[in-house]
């Protein structure tokens, strides 16, 4: 493996003192993925699965639980497009079950998946499918809103429209999310905070 992909080696260059090592911590945002096999020997520098997660959570902090955040992994390759992200929830649940066999290690305690909120009212069926496959771990969705007119600025992977937070269909989708007592996670640029503020005022019960 080339040094370019030696991420653990890069991280190990600096060791910081662990503050309050006994304080229980929930890691609120991580991903899990197989990644492509890119090296001639079949090794995979992009892989990040349960053992890799534990390697990080056992760095000296007292990390008890974690929350998985959607990253487009293991989507179904069949069926209606809107339901394909449910495959990611199923994938993470299986890893969570593996983790439960090692109760002394950090446990995956929540899943934030993806549902296209532009489905509007129809998003409810997809949310319910995630919830069924989530076996008690599915907590909500991330639909990122990051957008900028400057082509040199990377827009969010979910390909949002310019003012997606203000779209009627998007807000109707979030109403379904709120009605199911699920949470909404997003990311956006600073110049979109005003749109998010309008959204929050329009849906005050949304978590």
Where are these regions (language model features)?
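Helix-coil boundary/capping segments in enzymes
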Residues: 1-207
